[in-house]
Amino acid sequence: DAQEMLSRYSDELGVGMVPFREFVYLEEEKRYEEVSRVPKAARVASISGTQVREQYLNRGRTLPEWFTRPEVAEILGEAYPPRHRQGACIWFTGLSGSGKSTTAEVLTTLLLECGRQATVLDGDVVRTHLSKGLGFSKEDRDTNIRRIGFVAAEIVRHGGVAICAAVSPYKATRNDVRNMVGADRFVEVFMDTPLEVCEQRDAKGMYAAARRGDIKGFTGIDDPYEEPENPELRLETVVATPEENAASIVQYL
């Protein structure tokens, strides 16, 4: 397919192609041969580039010695670790009191038990350090989320798991973070908890203060929360425990 596509656009690209046919491995003769020259009764083996990625590298399987030298297979395994060793960003989003931080803590424990390097970036904690001095205007909220996203992207780039728990109410900003991290490494987890349940859990009295008008621009009361349209996971904390929800995330990963 790649050769056909390049041939089709070679004039436009100004790049010529030296075509080559597929080679397969003759198991009994222990040699390679161009596919059109292989006898019909011969036993052959072949692996495509897609199979190398999906069936071997992504699953941590060793490439067979007939396909490549062990030294090369080892280098490929280090350069393209299996999915369970790749970096990832688990981004919890939802209203205050929806269960983000609690589920994130349980998930962190599970991942550490599995031998993964996991780092929690809690929105409230980040505000007191990395984002100290920022307010709650839309601009400041976006800045806070992007700072968390930047740190998460660095963790992911070095093979770690960034577990981020932040209200992150705006779709556009969450998408910015997705692009920052890389769409294939970003797992958006929407904690789908009704507002009334979040208010019942209001241990800090923030919702009550917002209802009284003591706090302005509080998400869910007088500032909007934009629900994710297509999150990787949608979890309900009313019908499932934090342990069950964390297990669902591990299973997804």
Language-model region placement:
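ATP-dependent NMP and nucleoside kinases share a basic, alpha-helical "lid"
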Residues: H129-G135, A152-R211, G217
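P-loop (Walker A) phosphate-binding loop of NTP-binding proteins
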Residues: L95
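Conserved beta-strand scaffold positions in the cores of enzyme catalytic domains, especially
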Residues: M17-P19, V120, F186-E188, E232-R234
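Short, well-ordered alpha-helices that flank and scaffold nucleotide-derived cofactor binding pockets
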Residues: R8, E105, T109, E113, ...
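Hydrophobic anchor at the beta1->P-loop junction of P-loop NTPases
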Residues: I90-F92
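Conserved substrate/cofactor phosphate-moiety recognition/catalytic segment
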Residues: S98, A104-R157
